[in-house]
Amino acid sequence: WIECGEGSALGAIEAAKEVGGYVTGYVGDMTENGPDVVLVNLIWDLEPMFTQMLKDTHAGTFDNPWYKYGVAEGAMLYTINENLADKIPAEAIAAAEKAFDDIKAGKFTVPFIPQAE
């Protein structure tokens, strides 16, 4: 499962334990919540964004801007649960690494798709 949000991630971890599946931790490293079921983690590192906000505030230039921080800015990372790494095909790991590298290098832009009404 891949879920969005810490609460739903914790629920997905419990469900994976019950049925023997695998899950993606979300927001932070959730491996300790399910060391036998959390395959990978998508981690938010918002320190770069908050640092920029503080700098802008200190400089008097903070004017309610929209800060876009993601993979390219180092604010979205992933980790692999080393105890379960053998469950992930090497080509899948290589593809994920390439995608992250391409985003960081500006070779691929993740499209923004607003929610449809």
Predicted segments, located by residue:
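A residue-level marker of the well-folded mature domains of exported/periplasmic proteins
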Residues: W1-E117
